[in-house]
Curated annotation (Swiss-Prot):
GO biological process per UniProt: RNA decapping
Matching PANTHER family: BIS(5'-NUCLEOSYL)-TETRAPHOSPHATASE [SYMMETRICAL], METALLOPHOSPHOESTERASE
Cellular component GO terms, alphabetical: cytoplasm
Name of this chain's protein: Bis(5'-nucleosyl)-tetraphosphatase, symmetrical
Function noted in UniProt: Hydrolyzes diadenosine 5',5'''-P1,P4-tetraphosphate to yield ADP.
EC number annotated for this UniProt entry: 3.6.1.41
SUPFAM superfamilies: Metallo-dependent phosphatases
Cross-referenced Pfam families: Metallophos
Keywords noted in UniProt: Hydrolase
Length: 274
């Protein structure tokens, strides 16, 4: 059995299929883990989501910011932009089933036998594994309530929850977890989240900012962290304990698959439109 981890697909279904063919992926034998953002921007979000749903227990994904955005669009809480490229999936006959499936997906997953953790954007450096589990579970619980649209999705868009406060309660606590696990790139030196800079570290001109993974973290002492979200990194983080898998396929670059057991990355260039 092989574990394959794939970066942000964002509707690049043809490239995903090319990658899986390269490694002879077999869902009866292997597992496909995705760092989130299955949908948006790319041409085939509907096919991507249907494919992951069809894999059953052979597919393991976490929620990314675009997956949560799809929930907001379906719930009529946001208006879709042309760049979202989600009209087909929103008008599909199985959209409700797709949303229900997404609601069952967590913000983090573990592979304990390999001491591995996966989330979309990373993990706040001040969090222990126990805190990560607890905070992600609170969001999952809220997503599985009947009133999830009103109680969570309608209120999750806020930059106010920018700093971890263990005494926070209610929506502010949930907001920080969603912000950190699906939107994080840079932190200020005091630990606050920055929501503006998307440049790679070598191009960041604000001396107050550091990439989240450059802060000391208790988790990375014994765990590998797999994440996506930050395409500008192009997989370059300079730490063997970090696997950055978003390599900008929807922006014209390539899709990356990481074979855990071989510690090998396989890539597929963005296909040209026929």
């Amino acid at each position: 059995m092989a574990h394959y981890f794939v970066g942000d697909i964002q509707g690049c279904f043809a490239e995903l299929q090319k990658l899986l063919a390269k490694v002879d992926f077999n869902p009866s034998r292997d597992e496909l883990w995705a760092v989130g953002d299955l949908v948006a921007r790319g041409p085939d979000s509907l096919a991507t989501l249907r494919f992951f749903r069809s894999l059953g227990d052979s597919a393991k994904t976490v929620l990314g910011n675009h997956d949560l955005h799809l929930m907001a669009l379906h719930g009529k809480l946001k208006r879709a932009k042309p760049s979202d490229n989600l009209t087909e999936i929103l008008e599909s006959p199985d959209i409700s089933a797709s949303i229900d499936w997404l609601r069952q997906q967590p913000l983090m997953r573990e592979l304990p036998e390999h001491q591995l953790i996966m989330s979309h954007a990373g993990v706040p450096p001040q969090w222990s594994l126990e805190v990560l589990r607890e905070e992600a579970a609170l969001v999952s619980c809220a997503l599985n309530q009947d009133d999830y649209l009103e109680a969570l999705i309608s209120q999750m868009y806020s930059d106010s929850a920018e700093k971890w406060d263990p005494s926070a309660i209610g929506i502010e606590r949930l907001r920080y977890c969603i912000n950190a696990l699906t939107r994080m790139r840079y932190l200020y030196v005091d630990g606050r989240l920055d929501f503006d800079c998307k440049q790679p570290p070598e191009n960041c001109t604000n001396p107050q900012l550091k990439p989240w993974f450059e802060f000391a973290s208790p988790l990375r002492q014994c765990h590998t962290l797999v994440f996506g979200h930050w395409a500008a990194l192009m997989g370059n983080v300079g730490d063997t304990k970090l696997k950055a898998l978003d390599t900008g396929c929807c922006w014209g670059e390539h899709l990356t698959l990481w074979h855990l057991e071989k510690d090998q990355k396989i890539t597929q260039k963005k296909l040209k439109k026929s």
